[in-house]
């Protein structure tokens, strides 16, 4: 048994202790792997719960639905209008805490009403190294993080996902659309829609790991891996036309490249 198999076995032991679990499922790399493991371990005692908000891109909503159908797991949906939450809309540095608290409280209640007392999420070892106030909300609500408890890193999760033929094994890391707007700048539905449409257009050019950070509501700062900067320059005219058409007065490219949580630098 190799190291990955040992970690997966440990994950199954943890899930078995819960008996019945609901997985907070977004359709991303981590939650898809966790949902697969929960079903593999618990069968019908695994449930998926997806939170739907304006900060979740439409393609991810559709992807989550399709993955549940593929895995044969029952799914519940918890809708939340996050733009009605003052602590989300005003975008303070601890925005993620308030949003996660509301989302996971709702998903936990929904799961418990369906007979699943434990809600688990896809946090892993790598998530402990960045500024993540949302993890405090999970701890307060008693949300369990079995991937973290089993010592699984992002690389482990991708490797095991590939081993189990999960289509998300090489999917780019995702984050809610609100993470594209600098702290202190109000979040609106219009800004979230602009970012989503801009990123969808750029993804259509073949760019993979990318972010469109929206500064001041009208300056787009595009982040892509350095090796993909040439693609951006090749399509420069079309990118400028499209993003200005969406409402951006200025279209820029960050020469530092894609950086996870780059807006946390100012904290």
What residue ranges belong to the model's regions?
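Short, aliphatic-rich beta-strand segments
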Residues: 47, 212, 218-225
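Short amphipathic alpha-helix segments
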Residues: 189-209
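Short, conserved charged micro-motifs
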Residues: 228-238
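Short glycine/threonine-rich loop-to-helix capping motif typified by GTGT followed
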Residues: 186-192, 226-230, 263-267
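C-terminal boundary motif of the adenylate-forming
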Residues: 208-214, 254
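ATP-dependent adenylation/nucleotidyltransferase module used to activate substrates
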Residues: 1-163, 204, 220, 238-248, ...
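Short, structured loop/turn "capping" segments at alpha-beta junctions
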Residues: 153-159, 166-175, 208-210
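Internal, active-site/partner-interface "lid" segment
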Residues: 171-191
């Amino acid at each position: 048994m190799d190291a990955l198999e040992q970690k997966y076995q440990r994950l199954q032991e943890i899930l078995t202790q819960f008996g019945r679990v609901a997985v907070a499922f977004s359709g991303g790399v981590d939650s898809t792997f966790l949902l697969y493991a929960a079903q593999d371990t618990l069968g019908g005692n695994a449930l998926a719960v997806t939170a739907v908000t304006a900060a979740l891109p439409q393609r991810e909503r559709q992807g989550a639905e399709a993955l549940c159908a593929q895995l044969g797991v029952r799914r519940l949906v918890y809708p939340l209008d996050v733009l009605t939450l003052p602590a989300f809309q005003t975008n303070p540095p601890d925005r993620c805490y308030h949003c996660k608290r509301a989302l996971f409280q709702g998903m936990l209640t929904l799961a418990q009403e369906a007979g699943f007392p434990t809600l688990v999420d896809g946090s892993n070892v790598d998530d402990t190294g960045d500024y993540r106030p949302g993890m405090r909300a999970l701890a307060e609500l008693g949300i369990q993080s079995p991937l973290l408890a089993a010592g699984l890193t992002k690389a482990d999760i991708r490797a095991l996902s590939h081993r189990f033929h999960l289509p998300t094994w090489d999917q780019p890391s995702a984050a809610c659309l609100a993470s594209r707007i600098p702290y202190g700048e109000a979040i609106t539905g219009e800004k979230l829609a602009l970012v989503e449409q801009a990123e969808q257009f750029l993804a259509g050019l073949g760019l993979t790991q990318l972010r469109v950070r929206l500064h001041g509501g009208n300056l787009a700062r595009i982040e892509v891996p350095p090796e993909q900067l040439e693609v951006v320059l090749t399509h420069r005219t079309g990118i400028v036309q499209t993003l200005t058409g969406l409402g951006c007065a200025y279209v820029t490219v960050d020469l530092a490249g894609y950086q996870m949580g780059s807006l946390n630098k100012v904290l």
